[in-house]
Amino acid sequence: NDWAAGLPGFTDLHPQAPVEDSQGCLMVLHEIQEWFKGITGLPGVTTQPLAGAQGELVGLKLFQAYHRDKCETRDVILIPRSAHGTNFATATMAGFGGKQGKIVYLEADNEGRVLNEDLDLRIEEYGERIAGVMITNPNTSGIFESSFKQIAEKIHALGGLVYMDGANMNAIAGWIDLDALGVDAVHNNLHKTWTIPHGGGGPGDAIVAVSEKLIPFLPGYQIEFNGECYTPVKPEKSIGSFHRHWGNFAHKVRCYAYLLRLGREGVRRMSAIAVLSARYLHEQLREDYATLPTGSDAEPRMHEFILTLKTEDFAALESVGLRKADAAPRIGKLFLDFGFHAPTVAWPEPLGLMIEPTESYSKAELDRFAEAVKAILQLIKEHPQALISAPHFTCIDRVEEVEANRDVCLSESLET
């Protein structure tokens, strides 16, 4: 992927080069549009967003443009409490969280899914003020929103739109037609699902796929092909640009190389392995740990799941002076001692450890991980005080976050 992104034909071309000199680059963008139309089942794609959160903002701005074009004033956005945290921030940035709008939370049932009774109450309360709903699917607990289509139908009946947070797309890519599911806009993180390195501060990248009604409002340019030439065309009612030129173009090349390597069937296989890996690990660990949300243990997981300690294990930690709220972050540091990246802790469940193996690891590696997680629990049972001083084998025990934020070093001499 990096080899492809570093080819001189890509790296040496200025983003404002004439169309006739940019045919190779425009072809890549056009191909990505077509690939993600097939992957999502949606007829429109923009490649401009630089990250998942910016993709969300694109989606909500498209919603606003669509309603404005119909001379409708809709100032309410519905978001489940189980959604990704960026959804709430994005809705605020789009104007729904201030004086001109309102973010309304949807409660979850015992399995972590959207509580339909609560949705019905919100629909009754806000009616045609609802611009749309944002739902992460599968949700952050790794559970598929089985009533998604019914939710979409209710929102569409009001004239609202449906945004699906596609950050967990690696669980369903190639398996589900999002257009048939009722999705109007969805982002895909290229820096997570589609081979771009995840973490380390970026740079991220994304695409946004949309339903037919939102295509005229897409940002940036659509790349059209007439059989001979690739041409950038600005949509009729475009909401403008969210970034200069073509986004993180080198990431588009990396993603394109990955898609070509996978092929259509490989995309489906990638998702299948991600789900299989998560279910295999969950089956290995569910007897030793409790599963969150409480009451959802029997629900099949997709690509990830959330573990926590059992009641008696929390009691043992409290006996040595460690509060429940501090347990998950401390356990995460023990993962570092065992040579694994620390999991996401205390979110979306305050006492949770989020486990997401993805599609990248062999069964042997999954088994090694499961053994380590079981060993961590055994260590906690036998020596609960070990959590207080974790991690034990890293070069830095604890990051001084306050000092790091206040005493910022923006340049470092190379002659030290």
Where are these regions (language model features)?
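Aromatic side chains
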Residues: 66, 105, 144, 163, ...
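Non-catalytic terminal extensions of PLP-dependent enzymes
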Residues: 1-44, 49, 58-61, 116, ...
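Conserved PLP-enzyme active-site core in the AAT-like
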Residues: 24, 54-227, 237, 322, ...
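PLP-dependent aminotransferase class I/II
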Residues: 243-254
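A short glycine-/small-residue-rich loop at the edge of a beta-strand within enzyme catalytic domains
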Residues: 110, 142, 246, 268-272
